[in-house]
């Protein structure tokens, strides 16, 4: 008998949305961006691949939700000058990117998957730059500089950690020190 269209059949495991996201992030960390597929995730969870489309709409929706989960713990430190708070947000973001570098690569490949949490983080940084005395236009420019620097630094370190030549990562690289040097160029 053919099943009617609509909501997918309830999977025996009754897997929650949070469990799907946790397993998706774990699978991505294991197989990398190239090996991450809806079918592989479905097999891992023992569910129908259509389950993800029901919960997330499409692959971009799943990737966006994964990023929202990964980045949701990043917040604006409430104490300190705007510059100190910006550095705190960026160091936390760097740490999350370093924890999930393949997630960042997936987002770069699929711009429709750009997560709400990443937008929130950039808005926090932009507001703090304005509080530091920048115009909104200059703030937007510096948000791009700071966030792109953070992406590049985290991905470079993650790639070095995964390379056969440098299994321990680049121990000589100090993101906090490099960020401090860059922040000195703010002039705010």
Residue ranges and their predicted role:
Residues 75-115, 136, 143-146:
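Hydrophobic alpha-helical connector segments
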Residues 122-143:
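A contiguous pocket-lining binding segment that forms or flanks enzyme active sites
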Residues 19, 23-61, 65:
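Helix-turn-helix
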Residues 1-15:
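N-terminal intrinsically disordered/low-complexity leader segments
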Residues 67, 94-124, 155-163:
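Amphipathic alpha-helical segments used for helix-helix packing
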């Amino acid at each position: 008998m053919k099943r009617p269209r609509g909501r997918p059949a309830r999977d025996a495991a009754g897997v929650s949305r949070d469990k799907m996201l946790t397993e998706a992030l774990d699978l991505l960390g294991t197989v990398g961006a190239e090996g991450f597929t809806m079918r592989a995730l479905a097999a891992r969870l023992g569910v129908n691949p259509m389950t993800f489309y029901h919960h997330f709409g499409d692959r971009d929706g799943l990737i966006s939700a994964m990023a929202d989960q990964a980045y949701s713990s990043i917040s604006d430190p409430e104490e300190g000058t705007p510059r100190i708070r910006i550095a705190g947000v960026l160091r936390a973001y760097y740490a999350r990117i370093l924890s999930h570098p393949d997630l960042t690569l997936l987002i770069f490949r699929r711009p429709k998957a750009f997560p709400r949490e990443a937008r929130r983080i950039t808005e926090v940084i932009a507001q703090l730059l304005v509080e530091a005395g920048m115009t909104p236009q200059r703030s937007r420019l510096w948000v791009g500089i700071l966030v792109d620097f953070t992406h590049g630094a985290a991905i470079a370190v993650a790639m070095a950690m995964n390379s056969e030549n440098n299994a321990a990562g680049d121990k000589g690289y100090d993101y906090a020190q490099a960020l401090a040097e860059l922040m000195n160029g703010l002039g705010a």
